[in-house]
């Protein structure tokens, strides 16, 4: 049996690090198909922090793609598990036959599925990528993303799988002792990435609540984002008083981020695609309800787990938010499918499928 190779085909340090540490800590000991990785980007101490894994690093997406294609052609029994797929060369290789469908297994991260960029080169490439996606051996994704993907590619196999959010399961049913009265705190977005549409989200929050709430906007990631942070700050100050607007421009350590989320009463996410599952999971765990765009298919996953879902089109006020908090507090969070450790078994299943060990 040829050992499965995992591919992180784009240099996205935060997500790649999360995946590698998850495999090192939770999967590598029990499966030989969870140990070999090809990674676009620099080592940055990952070999040292993930000793159970065999890691090969490549300077860029193109270099990595060339190496993957060479391996695929040299051994047609070799299978690859692509985690997020932001690599144009790999899609083209799948479309042209350089990589065969039975060699190509893909875990959708969300941003790699949706066609939201307005840039010309992306608009031109999307139809090509769509054709390539029809040749994938099997996709793994959230319930909502599977539904979205199946409408375009009904013949491609799909299996439920969740991004391995770093979570302490002992906190699942820990009561949130934050007072549920008085001035509310609203978290806007899950990072400083433009895909969060911060300015539109701030306007939407203001339209719902006016200048009566504390607004927290975490923008410490990605790095070198000062111009956009200033743009968001200026737009925010045109709506909210300085004492109510909190733009966080420094990256927070995990425990500090967790503490920040537990101070919130509501999460507000205006983007129309599935993203930010990690932040959503941590908010739900802390008993904080979330507002989603109705076009974000992750609401299907939340509804399936009997979690309250608020939409950006709903009329929101403190009473609505407090009722959602009450409903969320009554949910047994230890049974939520996309929480740790429940997402582990689907990962074992995904490895068996991608490696050819399960039908």
Curated annotation (Swiss-Prot):
Keyword Aminoacyl-tRNA synthetase: no
Organismal lineage: Bacteria, Pseudomonadati, Pseudomonadota, Gammaproteobacteria, Enterobacterales
Role according to the record: Catalyzes the synthesis of Und-PP-GlcNAc-ManNAcA-Fuc4NAc (Lipid III), the third lipid-linked intermediate involved in ECA synthesis.
Chief place of localization: membrane
GO biological process annotation, one example: fucosylation
Claim: Disulfide bond is one of the keywords in the record: no
GO MF, one annotated term: fucosyltransferase activity
GO cellular component: plasma membrane
Keyword tags: Cell inner membrane, Cell membrane, Glycosyltransferase, Membrane, Transferase
Reaction it catalyzes: beta-D-ManNAcA-(1->4)-alpha-D-GlcNAc-di-trans,octa-cis-undecaprenyl diphosphate + dTDP-4-acetamido-4,6-dideoxy-alpha-D-galactose = alpha-D-FucNAc4-(1->4)-beta-D-ManNAcA-(1->4)-D-GlcNAc-undecaprenyl diphosphate + dTDP + H(+)
HAMAP family for the chain: WecF_RffT (MF_01002)
Lipid bilayer topology: Peripheral membrane protein
Native organism: Citrobacter koseri (strain ATCC BAA-895 / CDC 4225-83 / SGSC4696)
Protein name, per record: TDP-N-acetylfucosamine:lipid II N-acetylfucosaminyltransferase
Similarity section: Belongs to the glycosyltransferase 56 family.
EC number: 2.4.1.325
EC class: transferase
Pathway the protein takes part in: Bacterial outer membrane biogenesis; enterobacterial common antigen biosynthesis
NCBIfam families: PRK02797.1-2, PRK02797.1-3
Pfam families for this protein: Glyco_transf_56 (PF07429)
Subcellular location: Cell inner membrane
